[in-house]
């Protein structure tokens, strides 16, 4: 059987299984009050007519992106879900693996704590490619917390937290499906269905399949602009409620093959080339989680909960003759207790335990006679936290948290965090925050994509990363007749006391991950204005300024490959009966510093010293029907592409080969079409 037939068979099996499951569904409405396990997201109630991005009423600086906002773009996965967000930047981390990276508060996504339903997720080896592991149609909402946040979820948040909420087993029974195809020959199929088995017991199955047919080389440098990614992603979730007891649990698996590198279609043409440079990534990931909660005192919101998750992540990564192979296992558990001490006082306390194991084989040279090196990393961390919240009517909220953790590597460390929200008049919210965060660095796991570089990669002895974050913000909601205006301004400062620095500058022939020796900080200022009219028209304009610097070779320099500013404008229009919806997003990404250039053998410099600002335009039109919608759109319609993202592409085996210094889009304009199906739900 040919490979194309196998791919088609996979997709048919997945869709057929879900359709069969859908046909067995009992479409009875259910109303399960899941207050205990969803207490951290109960600030908003989402309906279709509300704004797509909502400012949380909590003490934290938190925005919640719901499905209405996600539907404004294709949003094939989590990495593509921030297209319309002024706060989060998304780009490719390199021109070789197709990995997406985000930046929050001007800093890498490694400093954002990733959560799925309030549990830590996608750490270590999963981190560089994690944003394509969460299919967009599976998500119910995304909450983005900036700066210091709660200590409940651990100590790893430095610039903020991103929490993904999936569609729920206990939601109204129904079936949803999504099919997507674009001009880059990418196909995606998604399906989700849930069923109420009996009173209090529900289950859900989510399925995702994607494949790219053929390769694309728009700049004719002999390298695929994006990899051929074939992914199968399955998730089975359960919910049971009996009296005061609630259980959530589930299992998931991801199987992904990513193929890229030299030649236009290496699947079929590799045999015709004498020595092609190929990049292959093969991932197998297995997940299991459970949540138990028991309501002790409903009048005081007293409850006790036990949450646990276990993951195994296997990655075989080949970069030419270099390689990184890892078998990672991690376990996390948390026991927590919450209660209202009185009308104005709330207390939360808990214990946590985590264990990380990475068995790694590493080959950093193309020399075929060099054997891989074995590296083992193991860390266990036990901790406890206490968090107190004071509220006075709707005007003042104070939240202070302190946690202490003991690491088998770094011994004892303390994490204090403080948040305050004050509402002097109706509609005006003032917030301030301060807090600390820590992070254990697994350099080869988190930066293995840098092995694609021809430079010699060196990793120094690294300490635990440590930083303080401070934030101030103000948002004001004003009604002018039937029009709604929301003005938001915010400033954040992140100050690193210890950091792992990726250094392209000190030595042209080396790429070093070294311990910070000097200052490293980030200042970000953002202002945005949202206007909502009663006539189906809304718009958001935003501007953000970044000042991000670190010490490289004893010099305090701008962080390379980081835009100095971002300006964004989004416009949405729905026709009176909401049959049609039109969305447009325009952004201007400011210029920035490039790493120190080096001389190529032909006498030219590898690149300049800075990159200029560049624009991007995305549009989408959606036609809504009763049980389905059809959407079509285009991305990067300005057709801006970074020139020569792969340096010295004709000789990838040399030290001059460099595909990891990406600062802009690496492929041009793209069009897509898709359909969303929804049965059994409003």
Task: Give the location of each predicted region.
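N-terminal periplasmic "start-of-domain" segments of outer-membrane beta-barrel proteins
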Residues: 40-73, 101, 120
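Extracytoplasmic beta-strand/coil segments of soluble accessory domains associated
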Residues: 79-120
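Short acidic/polar hinge/loop motifs at secondary-structure boundaries
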Residues: 119-146
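Short strand-turn segments of transmembrane beta-barrel domains in outer membranes
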Residues: 148-151, 161, 165-196
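Flexible loop and strand-edge segments within Gram-negative outer membrane beta-barrel domains
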Residues: 212-233, 241-304, 310-328
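Membrane-embedded beta-barrel scaffold of Gram-negative outer-membrane proteins
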Residues: 303-317, 423, 431, 463-521
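Gram-negative outer-membrane beta-barrel transporters
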Residues: 394, 487, 491-495, 515-598, ...
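C-terminal beta-signal and adjacent terminal beta-strands/loops
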Residues: 497, 588-598, 622-682
């Amino acid at each position: 059987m040919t490979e194309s037939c196998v791919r088609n068979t996979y997709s048919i099996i997945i869709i057929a299984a879900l359709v069969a499951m859908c046909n067995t569904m009992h479409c009875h409405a259910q109303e399960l009050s899941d207050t205990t396990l969803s207490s951290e997201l109960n600030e908003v109630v989402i309906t279709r007519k509300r704004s797509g991005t909502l400012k949380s009423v909590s003490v934290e600086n938190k925005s919640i992106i719901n499905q209405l906002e996600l539907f404004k773009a294709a949003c094939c996965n989590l990495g593509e879900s921030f297209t319309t967000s002024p706060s989060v930047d998304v780009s490719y981390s390199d021109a070789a693996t197709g990995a997406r990276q985000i930046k929050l508060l001007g800093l890498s996504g490694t400093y954002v704590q990733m959560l799925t339903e309030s549990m830590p997720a996608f750490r270590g080896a999963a981190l560089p490619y994690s944003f394509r592991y969460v299919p967009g149609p599976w998500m119910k909402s995304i909450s983005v917390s900036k700066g210091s946040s709660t200590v409940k979820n651990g100590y790893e948040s430095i610039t903020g937290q991103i929490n993904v909420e999936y569609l729920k087993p206990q939601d109204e029974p129904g079936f949803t499906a999504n099919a997507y195809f674009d001009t880059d020959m990418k196909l995606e199929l998604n399906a989700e269905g849930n069923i109420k088995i009996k009173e209090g017991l529900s289950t859900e199955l989510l399925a995702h399949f994607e494949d790219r047919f053929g390769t694309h080389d728009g700049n004719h440098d002999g390298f695929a602009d994006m990899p051929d990614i074939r992914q199968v992603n399955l998730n089975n979730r359960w919910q049971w409620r009996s009296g005061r007891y609630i259980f959530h649990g589930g299992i998931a698996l991801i199987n992904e093959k990513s193929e890229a590198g030299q030649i236009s279609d290496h699947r079929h043409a590799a045999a015709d080339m004498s020595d092609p440079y190929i990049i292959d990534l093969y991932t197998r990931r297995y997940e299991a989680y459970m949540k138990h909660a028991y309501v002790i005192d409903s009048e005081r919101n007293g409850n006790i909960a036990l949450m646990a998750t276990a993951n195994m992540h296997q990655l075989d990564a080949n970069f030419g003759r270099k390689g990184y192979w890892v078998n990672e296992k991690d376990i996390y558990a948390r026991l927590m207790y919450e209660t209202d001490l009185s009308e104005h006082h709330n207390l939360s306390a808990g214990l946590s335990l985590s264990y990380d194991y990475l068995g790694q084989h590493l080959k950093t040279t193309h020399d075929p006679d060099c054997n891989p090196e074995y590296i083992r990393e193991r860390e266990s961390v036990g901790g406890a936290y206490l968090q107190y919240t004071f509220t006075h009517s709707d005007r003042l909220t104070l939240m202070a948290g302190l946690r202490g953790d003991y690491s088998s590597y770094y011994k004892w460390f303390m994490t204090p965090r403080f948040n305050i929200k004050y509402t002097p008049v109706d509609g005006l919210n003032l917030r301030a925050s301060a807090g600390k965060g820590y992070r254990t660095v697994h350099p080869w796991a988190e930066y293995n994509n840098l092995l694609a570089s021809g430079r010699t990669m060196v990793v120094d002895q690294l300490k635990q990363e440590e930083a303080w974050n401070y934030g101030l913000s103000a948002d004001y909601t004003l009604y002018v007749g039937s029009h709604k205006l929301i003005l938001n301004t915010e400033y954040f400062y992140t100050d690193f006391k210890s950091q792992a620095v990726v250094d392209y500058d000190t030595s042209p022939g080396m790429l070093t991950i070294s311990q910070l020796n000097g200052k490293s900080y980030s200042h970000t200022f953002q202002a945005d204005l949202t206007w909502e009219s009663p006539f189906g028209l809304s718009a958001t304009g935003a501007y953000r300024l970044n000042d991000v610097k670190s010490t490289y070779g004893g010099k305090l320099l701008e962080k390379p490959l980081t835009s100095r500013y971002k300006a964004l404008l989004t416009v949405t229009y729905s026709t009176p009966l909401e049959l049609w919806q039109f969305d447009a997003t325009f952004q201007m990404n400011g210029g920035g510093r490039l790493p120190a250039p080096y001389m190529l053998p032909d006498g030219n410099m590898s690149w300049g010293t800075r990159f200029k600002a560049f624009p991007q335009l995305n549009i989408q039109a959606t036609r809504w029907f009763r049980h389905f919608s059809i959407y079509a759109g285009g991305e990067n319609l300005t057709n801006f592409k970074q020139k020569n993202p792969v340096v010295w592409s004709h000789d990838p085996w040399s030290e001059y080969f460099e595909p990891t210094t990406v600062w802009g889009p690496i492929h041009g304009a793209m069009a897509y079409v898709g359909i969303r199906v929804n049965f059994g739900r409003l």
